Amino acid sequence: SGLCENDIDVVFAGDLLNQCIGSSFSLREKQIPFIGMYGACSTMTLSLINAAVFVESGAAIYAAAVTSSHFCTAERQYRFPLEYGSQRPPTSQWTATAAGADIIGLGENKPYIEYATVGKIVDLGVKDANNMGAAMAPAAADTLISFFKDTNTVPEDYDMIFTGDLGKAGTDLFYELTEREGIDLRCRHSDCGLI
């Protein structure tokens, strides 16, 4: 980005650990204001939206959106510790061990954030902790349907539409729910949990 540490006005960061401890430790020696984000699978998007709002409002010139995840910590946090040795059903997610960061600032260069629609809780009563894709699919479908209505756009206006980690079962339900509203996403959508 060509920026120095002191060019960043605020960092929005999160991970899949209690108290955003991974993010806190990684930023503890930096002299940058830090706002912890905890949205599980939506942490990166949540961080990007907040960073964009800060920059657009003038509260920051540059804001960082950061997230990280670790397979073993996600297993411990959301399912069973690996030491427990439980069997994984086919609907279980496989959390990536990964990290990513974006710097948000005003400018004309693409890519840029033009729209954001924050989702709401849509609970269809899924109780299986090993089928988080089906638990998340209703909110993902509702958010995307709202986004198309809010922006007066259709799937064909986009090169690709990605969801985070619905997996196979969640993606099938996601398609079923969007198709009920007359929206066919099959040619424009990919789920990162299926890549």
Positions of PLM-derived features:
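Short, hydrophobic/amphipathic alpha-helical packing segments
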Residues: S1, M44-L48, A137-I145
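Phosphate/pyrophosphate-binding loops at sites that engage ATP/ADP/AMP, CoA/4′-phosphopantetheine
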Residues: S1-D9, T143-D157
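Claisen-condensing/thiolase-fold acyl-transfer catalytic domains that form or cleave C-C bonds
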Residues: D9-V10, G14-N18, S23-Y62, S69, ...
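Short, mixed-charge aromatic SLiMs
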Residues: Q19, H70-Q77, D123-D128, K168
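Short hydrophobic/aromatic-rich motifs at helix boundaries and adjacent loops
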Residues: C20-S24, C72-T73, Y115-V118
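Cofactor- and metal-binding active-site motifs of prokaryotic enzymes
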Residues: S26-P33, A52, E56, C72-W94
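Short, well-ordered loop/turn elements at secondary-structure boundaries
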Residues: A59, T97, P155-D157
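Condensing-enzyme catalytic core mediating Claisen C-C bond formation in acyl metabolism
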Residues: P81-I145, D150-T153, C187-I195
